[in-house]
Structure formats: C-alpha cells, structure tokens
Curated annotation (Swiss-Prot):
L-phenylalanine binds at residues 203, 318, 348. Belongs to the group II decarboxylase family. This is Phenylacetaldehyde synthase. InterPro entries: Aromatic_deC, PyrdxlP-dep_de-COase, PyrdxlP-dep_Trfase, PyrdxlP-dep_Trfase_major, PyrdxlP-dep_Trfase_small, Pyridoxal-P_BS. One of its GO terms (biological process) is carboxylic acid metabolic process. The gene is PAAS. It is an enzyme of class 4 (lyase). Homotetramer. The modification N6-(pyridoxal phosphate)lysine is found at residue 319. Bifunctional enzyme that catalyzes the decarboxylation of L-phenylalanine to produce 2-phenylethylamine, which is then oxidized to form 2-phenylacetaldehyde, a constituent of floral scent in petals. 2-phenylacetaldehyde is a precursor of 2-phenylethanol, another constituent of floral scent in petals.
Length: 508
C-alpha cells in the first residue's frame, strides 16, 4: 500500500505486476485463500470481544491516505483485514451475540452469495436473465406455502412475491401503491389528507417510509400501547383514532401491523385489525421481519392468523432463516397496483417478452431498476436444509431462549417484564432487589441500575445485548438467534449478567 505517484503510468509497471480483472485460475487460487480465511474466522470467533472496542476514526490511522498505484497480493490484503478490519467489527455471528435480532448465517447462504456474485447478472426484467426472474417466482411461492399464506398471495393465485433488500423498501413500495390507488379515487390534490397508522412499537421504518412517500408527517399516527395488551396495537384504539381523523376531514390510508415488534416481539392482533381496516378501506401491510421465519413452524403459525385480510406481507429471511444479508420477502395480493406505481418502460428496455404480459418484470415491483439475483441464495438455503431442518434450527433457538428465561426466573433479583413469544427474553433487575428505594423516583432508579448493568455486560466483551424502553421501563433484551449459539453460551451469558448485577447492586 502507498501513495499515488501521478508521474508514473502502466508502461512503467513490470510485466509481472500486470493483472487481469477476472482470471479463472487466479479466482480459484485466491478464492480458496478467502474461504480459508473466513473458515478460520469462524473457528476463532469466540476469541474476539463481541462488541468492537475501537474508537471513532481508528481506521484512518491504520490505512494510507490514498489508494495503491501498484497491485497488491491477496495475502497482503487479507493480513490487513485481519489486523485492521476484524478489530473494528461487532461480531454478529458470535455465539455470544444476543443484541438486536441476529442476522443468521449458514454455509448454504455463503455459497449462494458466491454464486450470485459470481454470475453477477442484473435481472431487472425477464429477458435480462430469465432464470433470475423465474427462480424468484418459484421460491416466493415455496415460501408462501411454508407460511401457509392464502393462495391470493401466490403467483398461482392472483398475487405474487418479490425479494427486496429490506423491510423499509417493502413498506415504501406498498405505501406508494396504496397512496396512488387512493389518490386515483379522491384526487391528487388530497395528498395532504392521507393518514398512516402504526403503534408506538412499530419499527421506525414506517415513519421513514411515510416521509419518503410524501405524506404529511403530522398525519403519522403512532398509537400508544400498554402493558395490559402486551404492548400490542389495540383494535379499539385504532378504530377511535381513525374515527377522530375522519371527523377532521382526513383520509385513512395505510396500517402497518407487526408480528414480533423489535422491542419485545409483541404480536399485533392481525385478524381484528384487518377487520377494522376493511371498514374504512385502509391498506394493511403486515411486517413480520423477525418473527415471520418462526411461522414456518406449525406451533407459531397462529400468530399470522387473519393474514388473508391484509393487502401485503413481508418478512426477512436474513434475520432468522439463515440466508444472510440482504433478503426481504414481500408478497402482495394485487401486483398490478404495485406495478402501476413503480413501472417505467423506457425504449431501451422494450422487448417482446415484456410486451407479451406473460412474464414478470421485477423492475416494476421495486424502487431501483437494477437488482441482485437474491433468489439463488434463498433457493440454496431451502434445498440444502429443507423445511424440516429449518424448523428445527428455529426450535433450538426458542428452546435456548426458554432456558435463559428459566434462569432469570430462578433469580429473585430479576423479573421478566413481558411474555416471551419467540426467542427474545426481556428482563431487568427488579425494583425489589434495590435495598434503598426512593418511591418518588423508583422507576428512574431501577432504569438507571439496569442501564448500568447493560453497559457492564457489553464492556466485558463476553456477551452483547441491547435494551428497549416500553411503558417508561428500561429492559434488557437477550435475543437468542446466532447460528453458532449453543446451550453453554446461554449459561455463560447468564453468569456474566449475574456477576455484574451483583457488583452493581452492592453499591445501592
């Protein structure tokens, strides 16, 4: 690595340094080196502190100020990855990673990504790579079957599915479709009257989508939830909010119901919410980003009962279906509504297949024109493990979460704040564990203690957890979901929690 000497040109580079951008034999050789590097990383992943300990700006001090003029060998680059990049990673695939929701990895997911990148096709329409489009059609119907989605969401019905990069993309696209469908009825001059609904537990993606789509930010409703409903959205509160908006002359447009909220995995009552929405002509999108994967298991499928009343449904296999970033599945009942809002057809893309209306052009189902061949890695995951193994992987995570939950319940200093629905346990040090408790500020003191506990856990490097604040209460989130996590890691994580709790409580 070094500075960029502008006075030199390629003629001055020794012939031995000239390289091809794509050489099959070099790819084979260097590919083996990279795969070995990644395999070694996974074998040694527990040696690293889960949460990176670097300071902001650390990397600029490690790397040159400009790109290298001459080529460098992959061995040198991998050495720098090990020395400079790995220390700056938060190790999401560590078995001691219990933060956020995991982004599960798998051998099949890795290999599928290699194939996707290796082929490097851009499947914006059918003719640009027929296999990319048709495989996506097939795997989306496969997954629809696994989730027991109504036929109205399948290509074999009148619906269909598409792979996006994130839930945000899925919600933006469906909200645009809902917006345009409504404005065709009431006139574009009424854009400022449209209202979007969610709960105070709905992912912030909904608010971002509302802003992107051009809906007045004052018309975004984050309906308050309470502990009495498990922090789920109340159909009665939705009805009251919609009625109030109608009295103001506003137009209810879009509802996002969540199956497995980020904070606590609360379950919005889908069937009842869809019933209310139908009365007012509101588009219902179901966000099951995390928990949707679990619904391939029969024992969790009931959580999406009522989905037949929704207009669209999405979940992220990159969260809990071992597919790797990025992969978001979106199904819609009426693809033509989506396409009418997102379709462009410039002359350079015109072709007989598209004109025949016999094929899907996925450019009309998303924001961007270009798109990756995401279906390939999803196909590899589904085929390599099968439905039975994928269900088993999810059940193992849930079982380990139950183990952690049991350990928490056995220690009287702690309490479980909300019911565990999947593999997330929300817990905290109980107010009763504090010897000196000022009733006037008990909530503040308990929140402070739990905040200190989380900071201590994460600073240890032995585990990484995150927090949520629900109903004004600060809770720790232990999200079991990393592919490599085993029962022993659950026990070790709990030991870390107990040790730091003891040290903190001794000061109160």
């Amino acid at each position: 690595m070094g500075s960029f000497p502008f006075h030199r040109d390629l003629q001055e580079i020794a012939s031995s340094q000239l390289t091809k951008a794509l050489d099959p034999e070099e790819f084979r050789k260097q590919g083996h080196m990279v795969i070995n590097f990644i395999a070694d990383y996974y074998q040694n992943i527990e040696k690293y502190p889960v949460l990176s300990r670097v300071e902001p700006g650390y990397l600029k001090k490690c790397l040159p100020v400009s790109a290298p003029y001459d080529p460098e060998p992959i061995s040198t680059i991998l050495r720098d990855v090990q020395n400079h990049i790995v220390p700056g990673l938060t190790h999401w695939q560590s078995p001691n990673f219990f933060a956020y929701f995991s982004s599960t990895a798998s051998t099949a997911g890795f290999l599928g990504e290699i194939l996707t990148t290796g082929f490097n096709v851009v499947g914006f329409n059918w003719v640009s790579s027929p296999a990319a489009t048709e495989l996506e059609n097939i795997v989306m119907d496969w997954l629809g079957d696994m989730l027991q989605l109504p036929k109205s969401f399948h290509f074999s019905g009148n619906g269909g599915g598409v792979l996006h990069g994130s839930t945000c993309e899925a919600i933006v696209c469906t909200m645009v479709a809902a917006r345009d469908q409504m404005l065709r009825r009431i006139g574009s001059e009424n854009l400022g009257k449209l209202v979007v609904y969610g709960s105070d537990q709905t992912h912030s993606t909904l608010q971002k989508a509302t802003q992107i789509v051009g809906i007045n930010t004052e018309n975004f409703r984050a309906i308050k939830t309470t502990k009495s409903t498990g922090f789920a959205l109340s159909p009665e509160m939705l009805r009251l909010t919609i009625s109030s908006d109608l009295e103001k002359g506003l137009v209810p447009l879009f509802l996002c119901a969540t199956i497995g909220t980020t904070a606590t995995t609360a379950i919005d009552p889908l069937e009842a919410l869809c019933h209310v929405a139908k009365e007012y002509g509101v588009w219902v999108h179901v966000d099951a980003a995390y928990a949707g994967s679990a619904c391939i298991c029969p024992e969790f499928r009931h959580f999406i009962n009522g989905v037949e009343g929704a207009n669209s449904f999405s979940f992220n296999p990159h969260k809990w279906l071992f597919t790797g970033m990025d992969c978001c599945c979106l199904w819609v009942k009426n693809p033509s509504v989506l396409a009418s809002s997102l379709s462009t057809n410039p002359e350079f893309l015109r072709n007989k297949a598209s004109d025949s209306k016999q094929v899907v052009d996925y450019k009309d189902w998303q924001i961007a024109l270009s798109r990756r061949f995401r279906a390939l890695k999803l196909w590899l995951v589904l085929r390599s493990y099968g439905v039975a193994n994928l269900r088993n992987f999810i059940r193992i995570h849930v079982k380990m979460a139950k183990t952690f939950e049991g350990l928490v319940r056995m220690d009287k200093r702690f309490e479980i704040l909300v019911p565990r629905n999947f593999s997330l346990v929300c817990f905290r040090i109980s107010p009763s564990a504090l010897i000196s408790s000022n009733e006037d500020d008990e909530i503040g003191m308990v929140n402070e203690v739990n905040c200190k506990l989380l900071e201590a856990i994460n600073a240890s490097g032995k585990a990484y957890m995150t927090h949520a604040v629900v109903g004004g209460l600060y809770v720790l989130r232990c999200a079991v979901g990393a592919t490599l996590t085993e029962e022993k890691h659950i026990v070790e994580a709990w030991n870390v929690v107990q040790d730091h709790a003891q040290a903190i409580l001794s000061t109160y």
